[in-house]
């Protein structure tokens, strides 16, 4: 254990898709200071997204310096650094110089679609699902690594000679912060690469062979809570987790059946399944999260495509509201949605339907329907879609949902949170601390060095600000949900398939 007596702070580095952030926490897990810096998004072609890895490192370093200065702290007062990051985004750099050979290919980038189609044609879907827990998609790192090695001249040969290194953003930052001494990732980030066997907890040789990725470029994989190395100023780097898994830990969802939903543009749902890697029959991803001390625990992950974006649509395209915050007021003005259902399948439907041909629709319109009813139906759609995913997770895992922890921008909406509790028939718990992702990284780092000693101590820090209890009778709940399911069924398979046009 490191001596942490005179070091009363932990810094969490939250490296996101559009900005880098640094958040300093004290021993009571209060936020002492925050710094944020946006960076440039590069779109070289339609569907392609890149970041400059050097800019990511520069903004992350600047945020750390700024957060320390704002709190009037010196680096020798920091007990540890925890890192959480945008997942799947891929960097390859030179071992000797630390210079990237290409921009970082971002998780949203679709350039490796053809590589993924070939994997499907080669009949690898079942193998990849069984081994990595993932579906074949350009989202994950494996096909991005192959694309760089295929397209940067001489890079595969250099990789074989051990001259190049691959990493997700956590790995890249640690390499830079330790002055090129440490090449490491954690189990949560490794589980998002499509190259990692989540059962044996090792890089999968067959996937490396299929994608022609030399093993020499891969980082060592470690637990999410341990000392990996030290920054140039001597601070231990002691926690790593991908952003969604960090939020799951920050919410203290460390036991099987505990789940969290992050309400953003879309919604990210993760449910802890403990020591059991559950293979989903409903299109969920099987991924690695963190157990009580940051050790490997499995989780199911599902995404809702349109959450907050549905409210943005009401504001920007339909002009029904001026501000997203107004939705709570309008939705609460009416006693129900007057039979209206809005299915926001603007880009198809995600889990558990996986229907790219579905399109959005409003159902149940009569002359008595007012704007308030439509606004209410839009908010309700977020809660219904969340139930769709959680029902599928419970079916897959056999775990009963104990409660739902929530974070993200939309959790400030009391109407939405209450309706979520009503339609799930379970407690919805909103934390006092909204920085759950950064808090998860801080918790993992703090546990590793003895800054915090036990899970019970952490649970006391993860204070729940408000619990929303279901106030709706079961018969009414199921009637509302049956209406939603009927509406969803009508939106399915709306667009013609490519071969029908």
UniProtKB/Swiss-Prot annotation:
Sn-glycerol 3-phosphate binds at residues 17, 87-88, 139, 243. Inhibited by fructose 1,6-bisphosphate (FBP). GO terms for molecular function: ATP binding; glycerol kinase activity. Glycerol binds at residues 87-88, 139, 243-244. The keyword DNA-binding does not apply. GO terms for cellular component: cytosol. ATP binds at residues 17-19, 265, 308, 312, 409. Key enzyme in the regulation of glycerol uptake and metabolism. Catalyzes the phosphorylation of glycerol to yield sn-glycerol 3-phosphate. HAMAP family: Glycerol_kin. This is Glycerol kinase. It comes from Pseudomonas savastanoi pv. phaseolicola (strain 1448A / Race 6) (Pseudomonas syringae pv. phaseolicola (strain 1448A / Race 6)). The lineage of its organism: Bacteria, Pseudomonadati, Pseudomonadota, Gammaproteobacteria, Pseudomonadales. The gene is glpK.
């Amino acid at each position: 254990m490191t001596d942490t007596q005179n070091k009363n702070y932990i810094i969490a580095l939250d490296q996101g898709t559009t900005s880098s952030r640094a958040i300093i926490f004290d021993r009571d897990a209060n936020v002492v200071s925050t710094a944020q810096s946006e960076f440039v998004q590069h779109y070289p072609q339609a569907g392609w997204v890149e970041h400059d890895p050097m800019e990511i490192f520069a903004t992350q370093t600047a945020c750390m310096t700024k957060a320390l200065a704002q709190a009037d702290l010196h680096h020798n007062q920091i007990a540890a650094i925890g890192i959480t990051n945008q997942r799947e985004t891929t960097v390859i750099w030179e071992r000797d110089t630390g210079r990237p050979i290409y921009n970082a290919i971002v998780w949203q980038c679709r350039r490796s679609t053809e590589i993924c189609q070939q994997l499907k044609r080669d009949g690898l879907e079942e193998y990849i699902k069984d081994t990595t827990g993932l579906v074949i998609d350009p989202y994950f790192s494996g096909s991005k690594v192959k694309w760089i090695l295929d397209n940067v001249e001489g890079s595969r040969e250099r990789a074989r000679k051990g001259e190049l290194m691959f990493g997700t953003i956590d790995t890249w930052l640690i390499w830079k912060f330790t002055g090129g001494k440490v090449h490491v990732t954690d189990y949560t980030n490794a589980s998002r690469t499509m190259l990692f066997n989540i059962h044996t907890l090792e890089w999968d040789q067959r996937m490396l062979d299929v994608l022609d990725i030399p093993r020499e470029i891969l980082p060592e994989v470690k637990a999410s809570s341990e000392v990996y190395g030290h920054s140039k100023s001597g601070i231990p780097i002691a926690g790593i987790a991908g952003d969604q898994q960090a939020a799951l830990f920050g919410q203290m969802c460390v036991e099987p059946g505990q789940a969290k939903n992050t309400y953003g543009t879309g919604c990210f749902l993760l449910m802890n399944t403990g020591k059991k890697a559950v293979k989903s029959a409903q299109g969920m991803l099987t991924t690695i999260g963190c157990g009580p001390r940051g050790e490997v625990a499995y989780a199911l992950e599902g995404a809702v495509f349109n959450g907050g974006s549905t409210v943005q649509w009401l504001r920007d395209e339909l002009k029904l509201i001026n501000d997203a915050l107004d939705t709570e007021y309008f939705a609460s003005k009416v006693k129900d949605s007057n039979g209206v259902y809005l299915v926001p399948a603007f880009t198809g439907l995600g889990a558990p339907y996986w229907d790219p041909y579905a399109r959005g629709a409003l159902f149940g319109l009569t002359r008595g329907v007012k704007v308030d009813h439509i606004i209410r139906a839009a908010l309700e759609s977020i809660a219904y879609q969340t139930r769709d995913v959680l029902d599928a997770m419970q079916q897959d895992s056999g775990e009963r949902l104990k409660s739902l922890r929530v974070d993200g921008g939309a959790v400030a909406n009391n109407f939405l949170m209450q309706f979520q509790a009503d339609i799930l028939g379970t407690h919805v718990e909103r934390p006092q601390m909204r920085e759950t992702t950064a808090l998860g990284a801080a918790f993992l780092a703090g546990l590793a060095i003895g800054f915090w000693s036990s899970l019970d101590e952490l649970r006391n820090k993860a204070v729940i600000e408000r619990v929303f209890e279901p106030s709706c009778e079961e018969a009414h709940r199921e009637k509302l949900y049956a209406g939603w399911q009927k509406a969803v069924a009508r939106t399915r398979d709306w667009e013609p398939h490519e071969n029908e046009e």
